[in-house]
């Protein structure tokens, strides 16, 4: 493939960001693509092209309606909405494409018509203008082969609703010019999308999963109703296949794409005739269900799981996509609760093999694995790893959760470090976050709510969550945290345990645990006071009142060693820091310390939220006791125990409940 790094932003693109974009096709997904681009790049000039004035008028009205709704919901200011609607026009004239640096076709799945469209586009745009198609199934080699400059063209497959769904497949085909795919990945990542690179196979990666999932559901109609199938399918997805087909008017799509796959790869992919004759399916809405006989439910469950396994191993065996992108794409783009590989891992290789064996017996011709199923499961799902000048750059990638930590993620980070910390070719490590919004938005609550009220189990939970951090404390090779965006809670605690911190200028830090009625249990009450004693008053405010700290302020205080303008510069600076720190010993953090006495405060957060007096008292006691501890290990243990104590308070129950219910906590009734 033409891509250089797993993290799209490690190296700066050689092309500028788009300034003038045209989208051909104003009737369906095209306007949504346009709204996403204008929301991310308000200064962009956007042209919507269509053959029907009515479609253009409706698209412009939809665009304005999206902006109006965003303002009404508090997602956008009036000024931002005005910028999103500025420099947006519609046209019937292809001559208006002149001067565009990117043209996206989202008009048709007819190959001949696509080729005619791109011939018309090439006649009007500069030779270096980028040209892409939003096709969900047609290979780039077929679409662009007749172009004069095919090297500037590829497929960028968006998912509905394109203004909100972050996933986009970027097709790395042999005709793509050097740097094209990487540039598009960079553009998408900078504008909030999740680019997933695939090869130029028919239907690419995610449509292979979704279309065959739906076609298999259609094959089950000989024994079950659409409602029964959707009910069982919700083991895997938030909305069943027939509900989604109704929503997307997707029956013709299944006919089209599975016919293409059948013609290309075999009759076992032929679409079920029922998709040609049914307009809408009778099926329950998400969150509701119908009764299904247990035996029938088992049959449906095995068939649906079987097609997921079959398609997944085929995608990986043929190199159509990566295992990490497959799982993440299924969750983010298609609404699966777990990716196929994640489901297989949780189910166990033996049970997955049973399901697959049954599926292949019932569906001869469908893909079978070339390796033992267990071999497909040995992959990282939440981090990306790149090698930059002898430094391992670890990128936290859970964009749907702002890169929040999970047990799996910390285990994967630790695994990368353990594998390479004794490798002489590796100088050290950089830890950064995916995208531009977040380094890490804290730790997922995970199973913590089940531990409320259990002091010892909660303290042990904090110890378990600290395995990676304690390992970082003892490392000889340097680890540098590169803050590409916000660092909250456990994410900031992770960064604090790295040898050095660097940040982009607009990054910021916060310890919001007190607003949940709990304490930060994995080092925040201990480490910052020992590493940066001059900033003790700042940490007092961050811990007790959830005060924010900007990267610029952290730089002035010496917490952040340097600031960068953007992510590529940030990673380069972090790598340079690693190399400069290589061989140097870390400053020991043992010994009692004497921070300034904690000042009396009102129990009110920096944002005005009333806080729990009891939680603040527990935190203040822990900070004092930890400061007096003779070793770092003893100080950390005080923090673990204090976290356990906080888990037994009424404030913790209220704070965690409020978080889950998406409301403000009321600590007035808890103390």
Language-model features: where?
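N-terminal glycine-rich phosphate-binding loop for ADP-containing cofactors
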Residues: 1-389, 397-400, 408, 451-453, ...
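Conserved CoA-thioester-binding segment of acyl-CoA-metabolizing enzymes
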Residues: 373-436, 456, 460, 470
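Terminal peptide-recognition signature
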Residues: 394, 398, 412-413, 431, ...
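Glycine- (often His-adjacent) and acidic-residue-rich active-site loop
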Residues: 433-468, 487, 515-517
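Acidic, divalent-metal-coordinating active-site segment for phosphoryl/phosphodiester hydrolysis
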Residues: 489, 546-553
């Amino acid at each position: 493939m033409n891509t250089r790094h797993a993290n799209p932003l490690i190296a700066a693109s050689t092309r500028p960001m788009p300034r003038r974009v045209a989208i051909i096709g104003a009737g369906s997904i095209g306007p949504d693509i346009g709204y996403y681009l204008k929301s991310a790049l308000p200064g962009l000039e956007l042209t919507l092209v269509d053959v029907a004035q009515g479609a253009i008028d409706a698209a412009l009205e939809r665009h304005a309606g999206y902006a109006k709704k965003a303002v009404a919901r508090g997602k956008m200011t009036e000024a931002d909405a005005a910028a999103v609607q500025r420099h947006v026009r519609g046209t019937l004239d292809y001559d208006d494409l002149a001067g565009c640096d990117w043209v996206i076709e989202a008009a048709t799945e007819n190959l001949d018509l696509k080729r005619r469209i791109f011939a018309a586009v090439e006649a009007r745009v500069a030779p270096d203008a980028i040209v892409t198609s939003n096709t969900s199934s047609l290979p780039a080699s077929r679409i662009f082969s007749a172009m004069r400059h095919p090297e500037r063209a590829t497929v960028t497959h968006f998912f509905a609703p394109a203004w909100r769904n972050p996933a986009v497949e970027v097709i790395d085909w042999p005709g793509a010019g050097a740097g094209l795919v990487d540039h598009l990945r960079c553009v998408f990542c900078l504008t909030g999308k999740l680019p997933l690179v695939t090869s130029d196979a028919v239907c690419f990666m995610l449509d292979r999963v979704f279309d065959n999932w739906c076609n298999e559901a259609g094959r089950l109609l000989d024994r079950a109703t659409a409602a029964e199938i959707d009910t069982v399918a919700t083991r895997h997805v938030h909305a069943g296949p027939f509900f989604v087909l109704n929503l997307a008017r997707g029956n013709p799509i299944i006919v089209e794409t599975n016919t293409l796959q059948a013609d290309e790869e075999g009759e076992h992919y032929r679409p079920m005739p029922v998709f040609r004759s049914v307009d809408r399916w009778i099926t329950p809405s998400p969150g509701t269900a119908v009764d299904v006989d247990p035996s029938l439910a088992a049959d449906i469950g095995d068939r649906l799981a079987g097609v997921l396994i079959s398609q997944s191993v085929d995608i990986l065996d043929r190199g159509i996509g990566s295992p990490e992108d497959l799982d993440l794409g299924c969750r983010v783009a298609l609404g699966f609760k777990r990716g196929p590989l994640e489901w297989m891992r949780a189910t166990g290789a033996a049970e997955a093999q049973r399901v697959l064996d049954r599926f292949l017996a019932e569906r001869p011709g469908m893909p079978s694995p070339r390796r033992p199923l267990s071999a497909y499961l040995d992959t990282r799902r939440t981090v990306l790893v790149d090698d930059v000048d002898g430094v391992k750059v670890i990128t936290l990638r859970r964009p749907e959760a702002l890169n929040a930590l999970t047990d799996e993620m910390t285990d994967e980070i630790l695994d990368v470090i353990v594998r390479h910390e004794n490798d002489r070719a590796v100088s050290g490590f950089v830890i950064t976050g995916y995208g531009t919004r977040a380094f890490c938005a804290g730790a997922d609550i995970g199973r913590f709510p089940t531990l409320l009220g259990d002091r010892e189990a909660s303290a042990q939970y904090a110890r378990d969550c600290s395995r990676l951090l304690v390992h970082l404390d003892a490392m000889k090779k340097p680890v540098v945290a590169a803050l590409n965006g916000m660092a909250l809670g456990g994410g900031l605690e992770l960064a604090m345990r790295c040898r050095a911190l660097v940040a982009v200028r607009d990054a910021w830090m916060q310890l919001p645990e007190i607003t949940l009625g709990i304490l930060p249990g994995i080092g925040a009450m201990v480490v910052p006071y020992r590493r940066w004693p001059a900033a003790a008053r700042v940490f007092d405010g961050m811990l007790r009142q959830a005060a924010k700290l900007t990267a610029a302020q952290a730089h002035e205080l010496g917490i952040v060693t340097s600031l960068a303008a953007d992510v590529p510069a940030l990673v380069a600076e972090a790598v340079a820091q690693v190399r400069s720190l290589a061989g140097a010993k870390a400053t020991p953090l043992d010994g009692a310390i004497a921070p300034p006495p904690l000042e009396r405060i009102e129990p009110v957060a920096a944002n005005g939220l009333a806080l729990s007096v009891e939680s603040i008292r527990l935190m203040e006691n822990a900070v004092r006791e930890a400061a007096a501890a003779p070793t770092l290990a003893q100080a950390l243990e005080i923090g673990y125990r204090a976290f356990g104590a906080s888990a037994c308070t009424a404030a913790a129950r209220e704070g965690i409940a409020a978080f889950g219910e998406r409301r403000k906590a009321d600590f007035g009734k808890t103390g």
